[in-house]
């Protein structure tokens, strides 16, 4: 229905792209895998990868389609919300945001702030990092509300901040990172949506402002399609779908999705824009991998440095202990009436160095 079928093979696609110098230059700079993604899109084998920032933000653009992001966030939060504004990342306190492949911050109608983030390298996004992102959202809101209310500021004017993180892959076989293992703990089972907030072990009920919603998209792919036929299943299915065959099945189940896939297929008529989006996504992935590898290397260096320092400390401890033993031996030999010369000979046998033996006798005799 929405598959273009304009091109019969790769040569046909590349001939078409070559008519657009900007798109052609970008396309020729791609690695083979990314060229294949572009080719598959134009050949109607694959849809656009919506989990990448440029594609997600285009399809969920709040100026053009104000309802889509509202519906997605509503489905995740389990309550109806309305997105009223998309915020910029320019005033964020966190400058190391490059490990995300998609990041969008919005304000809801009630004043609360939500960030929707998609992470491809799950190991690079541990709980500590999520905590910092949430704190950044809260402080951003605090500054805005305080500046607006000035002398009338009251903490009760602050609204919730929701941190939504969608992990593309949480396969525990690929890494022993805590975030992977957490998603696949036995007690978790096949659950793919996890909601967390601050609670007290005594049952004390206080409502804090920071909520977390974590989604494992790979777990959803395994079990989600068979779950209840609800709004959340529909939107996550959209994000998880890669082929037009699956897209057609989705549209049979959710007819309202046909508009989205029609829009996706229309980009085939604008190669400069679609190849540009692929280029932007590729750059983000390269930056992600660079920063991830840099972080991994730094962590490895710090670990090795710590091991060296521990070994040095152990060596120093051993040296101190051996000095104490030599001192005790020398004192005992003195009591026994042993001569310096014989003591030097005895110690030289132990430490295999006559010079060292002489220094020890000089020090402790």
What positions do the PLM features span?
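Charged, alpha-helix-enriched surfaces in structured cytosolic catalytic cores
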Residues: 64, 68, 125, 230, ...
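Short hinge/gating elements
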Residues: 52-60, 217-224, 246-250
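Accessory alpha/beta interaction modules
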Residues: 1-211
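Short conserved micro-motifs at the rims of enzyme active sites and ligand-binding pockets
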Residues: 175-178, 224-229, 276-277
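Short, solvent-exposed polar/charged micro-motifs at secondary-structure junctions
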Residues: 92-98, 224-226, 259-260
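Short, charged alpha-helical interaction segments and adjacent helix-coil junctions
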Residues: 2-44, 114-119, 237-365
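Extended serine/threonine-enriched, polar tracts that run as long, contiguous segments within proteins
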Residues: 193-235, 239-240
């Amino acid at each position: 229905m929405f598959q273009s079928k304009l091109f019969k093979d790769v040569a046909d696609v590349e001939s078409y792209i070559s008519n657009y110098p900007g798109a052609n230059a970008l396309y020729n700079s791609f690695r083979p895998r990314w060229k294949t993604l572009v080719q598959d899109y134009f050949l109607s084998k694959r849809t656009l990868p919506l989990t990448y920032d440029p594609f997600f933000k285009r399809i969920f653009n709040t100026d053009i389609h104000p309802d889509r992001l509202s519906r997605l966030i509503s489905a995740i939060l389990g309550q109806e919300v309305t997105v009223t504004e998309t915020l910029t990342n320019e005033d964020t306190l966190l400058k190391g945001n490059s490990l995300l492949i998609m990041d969008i911050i919005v304000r809801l109608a009630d004043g609360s702030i939500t960030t929707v983030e998609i992470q491809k390298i799950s190991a690079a996004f541990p709980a500590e990092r999520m905590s910092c992102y949430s704190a950044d959202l809260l402080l951003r809101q605090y500054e805005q509300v305080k500046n607006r209310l000035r002398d009338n500021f009251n903490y009760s004017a602050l609204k919730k901040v929701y941190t939504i993180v969608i992990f593309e892959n949480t396969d525990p076989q690929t890494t022993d990172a805590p975030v992977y293992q957490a998603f696949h703990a036995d007690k978790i089972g096949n659950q793919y949506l996890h909601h967390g907030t601050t609670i007290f072990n005594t049952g004390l009920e206080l409502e804090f402002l920071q909520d977390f919603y974590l989604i494992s998209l790979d777990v959803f792919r395994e079990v989600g399609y068979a779950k209840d036929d609800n709004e959340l299943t529909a939107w996550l299915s959209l994000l998880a779908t890669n082929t037009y065959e699956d897209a057609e099945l989705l549209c049979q189940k959710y007819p309202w999705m046909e508009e989205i896939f029609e829009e996706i297929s229309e980009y085939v008529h604008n190669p400069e824009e679609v190849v540009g989006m692929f280029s932007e996504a590729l750059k983000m992935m390269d930056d992600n991998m660079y920063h991830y590898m840099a972080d991994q290397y730094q962590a490895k260096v710090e670990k090795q440095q710590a091991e060296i320092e521990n070994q040095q400390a152990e060596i120093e401890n051993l040296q101190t202990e051996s000095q104490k033993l030599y001192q005790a031996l020398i004192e005992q030999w003195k009591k026994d009436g042993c001569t310096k010369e014989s003591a030097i000979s005895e110690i030289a046998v132990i430490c295999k160095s006559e010079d060292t033996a002489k220094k020890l006798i000089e020090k402790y005799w």
